[in-house]
Swiss-Prot record:
Residues holding ATP: G66, P67, E68, S69, S70, G71, K72, T73
Disulphide linkage map: none
Subcellular location: Cytoplasm
Name of the protein in question: Protein RecA
Any GO molecular function: damaged DNA binding
InterPro entries the UniProt entry points to: AAA+_ATPase (IPR003593), DNA_recomb/repair_RecA (IPR013765), DNA_recomb/repair_RecA_CS (IPR020584), P-loop_NTPase (IPR027417), RecA-like_C (IPR049261), RecA-like_N (IPR049428), RecA_ATP-bd (IPR020588), RecA_C_sf (IPR023400)
GO CC annotations on file: cytosol
Native organism: Nitrosospira multiformis (strain ATCC 25196 / NCIMB 11849 / C 71)
Function, in words: Can catalyze the hydrolysis of ATP in the presence of single-stranded DNA, the ATP-dependent uptake of single-stranded DNA by duplex DNA, and the ATP-dependent hybridization of homologous single-stranded DNAs. It interacts with LexA causing its activation and leading to its autocatalytic cleavage.
Length: 339
């Protein structure tokens, strides 16, 4: 670039920074753009690895969708619990009016510090989300769910009255407004979404998510969560086998999958994942029903090993660190010290 053009560019950059603030424009190579993505653990080791960066990215929009009772709310509550352990603050916008505080507490959520809002309509819910994001003091905002964000006009109208495209228009407008504020405040906003069936689809999947197409475009990460089976202890069902597919990922390669167990009343079984991934990466030796670590037997059967790792947290953490090192995914930030 010749000298005159360089001077003109420098003057323009200076004017932009003066008018819009420092950092409003920067050179990609000389900045931290795209480097060292700050993440929050999902509470699932396998999913952290599948996401490629060790968790869900901060300053981004995340969509988690799936059929009913597939573990969508459980996964988001685990993210909130992980954020709180790191000393962060979270807010839960409960548009479905269905959050169970006792269940959240069992998953490790500090319900005393969790901010909760149960809005009357979709506009109110998204306005509250925007105000929380703009405050810059919230780390995670969860909206549960997109399907329950009923536009005010629909609530005030007659039952059965056609309201074409109101929901999609509401989401599109809100996301245009939210996206810049989310990046500036480094807040992660998680939208939980439901599945609907498209009518008359001959080829391909008839499934679609609610709220139009805007969220699909604005989301940096989209997770498809499904229940694949039941976990039994004798005849009693104690949990569900779950598979999550990373359908979209702007911070790492997409289309990876993770499988884990969700135990009723406990949430994601971290110890179960450590066992499976430990065996996979040859850190834990499996011979018949027996499991051994560093030559020492740690239990017979997966349930007994899971209990052993719960009692010996230091060994569980050691194996987890080795798994993360083996796959090249760093540990999330250590929890903030308690005052």
């Amino acid at each position: 670039m010749d000298e005159n053009r360089s001077k003109a560019l420098a003057a323009a950059l200076s004017q932009i920074e003066k008018q819009f603030g420092k950092g409003s424009i920067m050179r990609l190579g000389a900045s931290d753009v795209g480097k060292d993505v700050q993440v929050i653990s999902t509470g699932s080791l396998g999913l952290d690895i599948a996401l490629g960066v060790g968790g869900l990215p901060r300053g981004r929009i995340v969509e988690i969708y799936g059929p009913e009772s597939s573990g969508k709310t459980t996964l988001t509550l685990q993210v909130i619990a992980e954020m709180q352990r790191m000393g962060g603050t979270a807010a839960f916008i409960d548009a479905e009016h269905a959050l169970d505080s006792q269940y959240a507490q069992k998953l490790g959520v500090n319900v005393q510090d969790l901010l909760i809002s149960q809005p009357d309509n979709g506009e109110q819910a998204l306005e509250i989300a925007d105000m929380l994001v703009r405050s810059g003091s919230i780390d995670v905002v969860v909206v549960d769910s997109v399907a329950a964000l009923t536009p005010r006009a629909e609530i005030e109208g007659e039952m059965g009255e056609p309201q074409m495209g109101l929901h999609a228009r509401l989401m599109s407008q809100a996301l245009r407004k939210l996206t810049g504020n989310i990046k500036r405040s480094n807040t992660m906003v998680i939208f939980i979404n439901q599945i609907r069936m498209k009518i008359g689809v001959m080829f391909g999947s008839p499934e679609t998510t609610t709220g139009g197409n805007a969220l699909k475009f604005y989301a940096s990460v989209r997770l498809d969560i499904r229940r694949t089976g039941s976990i039994k202890k004798g005849e009693e069902v104690i949990g569900s086998e779950t598979r999550v597919k990373v359908v979209k990922n702007k911070v790492a390669p997409p289309f990876r999958q993770a499988e884990f167990d969700i135990l009723y009343g406990e949430g994601i079984s971290r110890e179960g994942e450590i066992i499976e991934l430990g065996v996979q990466h040859k850190l834990i030796d499996k011979s018949g029903a027996w499991y051994a670590y560093k030559g020492d037997k740690i239990g017979q059967g997966k349930d007994n090993v899971r209990e052993y790792l719960k009692e010996h947290r230091d060994i569980a953490m050691e194996i987890e660190s080795k798994i993360r090192a083996a796959v090249g995914v760093s540990n999330p930030a250590e929890p903030a010290p308690v005052e």
